[in-house]
Each structure stands twice: as C-alpha cells, then as structure tokens.
Amino acid sequence: MRHGFVKVAAVTPDIRVADCGFNEESIIKEMKYCAEMGAKIAVFPELTITGYTCGELFLQERLLSAALATLKEIIKASVGLDMLTFVGLPFETDGKLYNVAAVFKDGELLGMVPKRFIPNYSELYEARHFAPCVGENRLLDWEENSSGYTYFGNKLIFENKDIKNLKVAAEICEDLWVVIPPSNHHAMAGATIIANLSASPEIMGKQEYRRNLVQGQSARLNAGYIYATTGEGESTTDLVFGGHNLICEDGIILAEKPRFKNGTIITEIDINKLAYERRKMNTCEIMGWESYDFIDFSYENVYTTEKNSEGKSEKRLIETSLLRTFPKSPFIPECKEERDSSSEDVITIQALGLKKRMAHTGCKYAIVGLSGGLDSTLAAIVICRTMDMLGLSRENVIAVTMPCFGTTGRTYHNAIKLAKELGITLREINIKESVLSHLKDIGHDVNDHNVTFENAQARERTQVLMDLANEYGGLVIGTGDMSELALGFATYNGDHMSMYGVNASIPKTLVRQLVRHAAELALEEGKKELSDVLTDIVETPVSPELLPTNDDGETEQKTEAIVGPYELNDFFLYNMVRWGMEPDKLYRIACLTFADEYTKEEIEKWLKSFYRRFFAQQYKRSCLPDGPKVGSVTLSPRGDFRMPSDAVGDLWLK
C-alpha cells in the first residue's frame, strides 16, 4: 500500500445455477486465495451466489432465502481475510427484488449497492425479475453487524481510514453501458476505484467492445476499474458467458483474463497516480458528494516503523509486493505494429510543426548542423518530410558538418553519406581555426580541456548556423532532444538555441526508435544505402565529441558515462513528469524494472544525478525555442511544464 499501490482481484469462480451451497464453497475458496495473494479488494461477478441465469427461479422465495443465508455464511468466512469484498446476489426489500452487490469485510456487511439500470432488450430481460434502484440511500436492519444495520443504495463510497485516496464504489454490469453510468457520479464524488460486478454474455466481436468500454471508462474517470464477469457454470440454454475480466487504471489495461476459462486476475492499482492525474486535470470536478454516504473501513497492520533519511523513526505504510510491471521504455510502445504507427505519427507531427513555421515566415531554406549523430539525423529526416509537404526541393535543406577536435571518422563519414542519400545540400566548415582563435582571444589554454573548451565549440557551431541562416534567408532547425534538456546536457546559447526545435519533446530513447524506424522504412523502399547509414548511426555510441580523439581517432567521451544511461534517465523523466512519482517510489519501480541491468546502487546514483541536473538546469529550459509537442510529456516552459528556474530540489534529493 506504500506509494499508493493497492492489490486488487477480479474473480470468476466456478458456479452452478441455483446451487447456493456449491457457490458458497467456491466463493469462499476464491476469497481465501485472493487474501493469500495479498489482495485488499476482491470483486466477484453479478449474482454470483445464485448464478445470473436462474430466470423465473429468482422469484422463488426458496432461492432468495437461500441466497441471503449463503451471503451471511460468506461474510462470516471473511473474518481475518482483511479484504474488502464485492459479491452479487438477488436481495428483496420493501416488496421489491434488487440485483445487488454486497460489500463486506471481516464479518461486517458494510453496504449493499443495487443495480441502477435494468436491461430488458435483446437477450437480456432482467426487468421481468428485478427493480431499478432510484432515490436516496437508506439504512437496513442487519443484526449480524455490530451496529445492527447496514447501508442500502447506489450512492455509497467505501473509504479507507488509513490510506489516503482509497475510495471504492460499485456499479453493476449494465450500469456501465448506459449514457451516463453511475460510476461517473461516483468518481465526481471522489471514488478512485470502481468495482463492476457483471454478467456479460459472449457474442462475436463483443470482447473488443467490452475491453474498449472498460478501458475508456477508467480513462474518462481517471480511476481504477475492476471488472469481474461470470463465466463457465452459467446456463447455456441460450447464452455462453466467457469470464472476460479486466483491471484497468486511467485507460491502461493492467490485467486481463483470457475468456472461456474461470479464474482470477490480480494486480495493483496505483491510487496515488490517479490522485496526481486528478489534481493536474482541473476539469476533473469533485461535486455531488453531499448526496453520498461515505462508509469507513480499515485494514489490519498497514503501518510499519522505519528510519527516514535523517535517521529519525517514522510511521509508514507497509510495502505491497508488486505483481504489475512497468515498461522499460515508457515513451515507446511495446507492440511493433503500434510502435511503427506511432513513429509515423511523431515524425508527421514534427514535420507539420515545422511546415507551419516555414510557411508563416516565408522561409524556403532550412539550416541544420549535421553531426552524424542521432539527434541531427532525426532532424534531417523531419526537415526532408517538411520539404516534401511544402513541395520544395530537398536541396533547400542546408546540412552543415563542422568537424573539430573531437570529430571521429565514423560520425563524419556518416554525416556525408546521410546528406547524399537524403538528397540534401551538404556544406563542410571546419571550425578548428575559429575555435582556436577564439580561445586565444579570451586567454584560454588550448590544452585545458575544461567546459570552456567544450562550449566554445558548441557556440561556434551555432554562430555558423545562424549566420548561414541569414545568408540563405532560412531557419536554423534545432536538433537537441528532451532528454538532453531534462539533464541540461546542452550548451547554453549553443546547441541549446535555434529558430525552431523539432526534437524538443522527443526523448533520446524515442529518437533512437524513430531513426531505426526510418532505416526499416528505407529498406522496404529499396533504399539500402540510406538504411545502412541510418542503422550505423543508431548503433553509434552517443557522444558530443567535444574532447580531442585518442591516437586511434576514436572518442573517449561517452555521454552516458557522464549523465547516466538514457534508458534510465528517460524512465525517470517519464514517471516523474507524467505521473508525479516521488523519489523513493521511482527508485523502487526502477529497481524492479531494471533488476537485470543495473544494481540498486547504480540506480540510486543516476536517480540522484537526474534530480540534481533537472533542478539545476531549468534556466536553460525556461528560454527554449518553439517546438512541437508530440507526446504526453514535454518540458516546454510555455506549455506543460512551467517550473521556476530557481526552484530548490532538496526535497527530491533526500
């Protein structure tokens, strides 16, 4: 539960139609399994105690009394499981029969949530048996509870007393499929997790529709959504039920059970992440909570005592063992088809952004420094796409290679080959003499290879590009990527500056993927030479090449040895900015995700380095050139990330 992780389960138990005794044993068995797995919330299907397909038997007193007696036994069996549980059954009160979710924990029935919308169309004819629940919540006598009563109504939220933001509400099957689901109101009243007890029959194509519905609702509500539906064991007189269970979090499917086989899926929902998203989205209004009853519940042994960074003892929530995983490259889709599609989208967005800027300024030429590295290669690809969109010749792309002390043969020749294969104009301007003259002018020893030595080269290159832009009447296109901007690994008013930065919201790991995608595309189009040079650029170690090469003509200046592995930095960047993760949580999930690649000590080292750089280098980001947003994370000071340049980062370094 520490860091907001709550382990939840969606269960499809084995059942028999109208056999409450068998179903009781099956439900209790699955409850105990979920508890053993550490689940703190378990959701069972609609009408689980009796089965959904009882038909006219729902009107029989014999079945209703058996269902109620079974519920009481199941609630007794929940003692000691320390788990909030949702189970469906038919329940009669005030002369009407309701389809309800019984919500209980450790022997106490906390409430009953009746189904709001009763379907009576196609294969569904629930209105023949059940009444919809409208009106306000009310109290029901329930002598088994210590209070002697329980709550009844569909405006109930079950709120944990110890765990901030853990507020759970329920809806039942059809409630989700209507124009305005009850869960909309639940979320607006503060619920962060929705339990849906369902009995959704299978027909051709319904699986995808159901998946999209659950996934979309969790995204719309910025909520966790636990969807448990009935499966094998229901009557097959007219229908088949597949047990298609889903657990989603803010539009992301965390767990999905294969259909046509009963069983349980368990994962963790991150309620802190959901709370962060709701804080950020000011259109996510909290309203209507006055009409809700908030029912407290608590868990046993949720706290432990640990020493903090200052050596003082403090009470903290226990750490939940995690079953869920986190993508190592969060900026890149894991599925190849989706990866290829998104790569095309990103390059198109970049190109369209530049197209508008060139059309607005009336410029016909684009000036770009071409180093033979990843960033400038991607920029060149984007500029070519822009020129094609504008109907201009690619010869209007003025690619400038500016070798100096640290330029290697590999990057130099790759820049030349790339310009040739892209069909763009290449100019070579050696800046060694200019830099040496400048260093002499300021009295700097050329043998002192400090930051002045390095930055003088970067600023000289920018000056050359700016002057050429004047010469051609064109725009200098920035090549720096978002990872470099996050780390401040850019020379202020050097490569940091341009007239339009096409890579400003592209992290380094995504830059590599986009160039790799371009290589694959070139090969498909029969452009093997272009594909080969792009592939070699992808495989070239990242380096600014600002320090002199060794005797073999190779650079010993490796960027990732200075600032840390980009896969780690991009992982940190995404989870910090996108989800607002606190440092110890980010460290924890990084250790889990990269356990096979880095030691905990290495991860801690680079995480602290990331935070130090991120805060210290904001002043560079505060004056960034314009550039298009392409993903959910960007550091534009005019857009998504407005941070003061003099903010203190001590809290993130403790």
PLM regions with names:
Residues 1-367, 385-394, 426:
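Enzyme catalytic cores with a strong preference for nitrogen-chemistry domains
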